Amino acid sequence: MDEKSKLIDRYYDRYFESYFRRFINSFFRFNALPVVYTLGIKYLCNQKLRYMIIETKHLIIRYFQEKDVAGLLEYLSHPRVNCFVGDRLCSVESALAYISNTPKDMLRYAVCLKEDDFIIGDVFALREYTDTFSVGWHFNQRFEGKGLAYEAATEFLDYLFCDAGARRVYGFVEDDNLRSKRLCKRLGMRYERCMKEFISFVCYPDGTPRYEDTCIYAILNKEWTEQREQKPNSLGLCRVVTDMHEMNEKKQ
């Protein structure tokens, strides 16, 4: 292929990419995700969401990078609650796999300090239906007591409702996980019920399963909107949402 043909191909590739991104953005802007799913481009929508970046007063919530491995190992080498035993990372290789092998229906982001981009946790959401997400989070114990988990979770929920088309967001919380229960309440999530001995993640010393009492906390889009209108920008957040393509274009 000669140089002229290569330039023409490159032009059409960039034109198509730009056009397609505007096409997808229009669905997000008008909250038409059910139509998007019907058209069969759910995976492409999740790919767009996956590369979003949220900037708050103290944090950057972004897609994972290889430099996050050390920070990931710091808080996931010894998960503090039983439900995340399966996420335990024991090596650099397992941390790299955690970063690169995010399920297609899951959104998972690194929560990093704005001052030095060091990862202190992550937030994630699994799309279970077109407009329903199950959420969760990990945070480094070393950074507790500063309101950072609340800041990250607040903006993540706002992102799910405003940008990802969520109608309902809920989370499973073990009954003895007091930190997450307090966080859910502070976020305005409604306690719905507690399922006794719902699931087992670990065993007792004698090998018998230890079943956990599991609570459900949830909130609807309309409840979140009403709550945010009553206390607009209560954290003093400077929320900026962008995506990887826009960042690269700005750098160029």
Where are these regions (language model features)?
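Short hydrophobic transmembrane-like helices used for membrane targeting/insertion
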Residues: M1, I8, I24, V35-V36, ...
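Basic polycationic patches enriched in arginine
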Residues: R10, R14, R21-R22, R29, ...
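A short, aromatic/hydrophobic, helix- or strand-capping loop or linear motif
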Residues: F84-L89, L107-L113
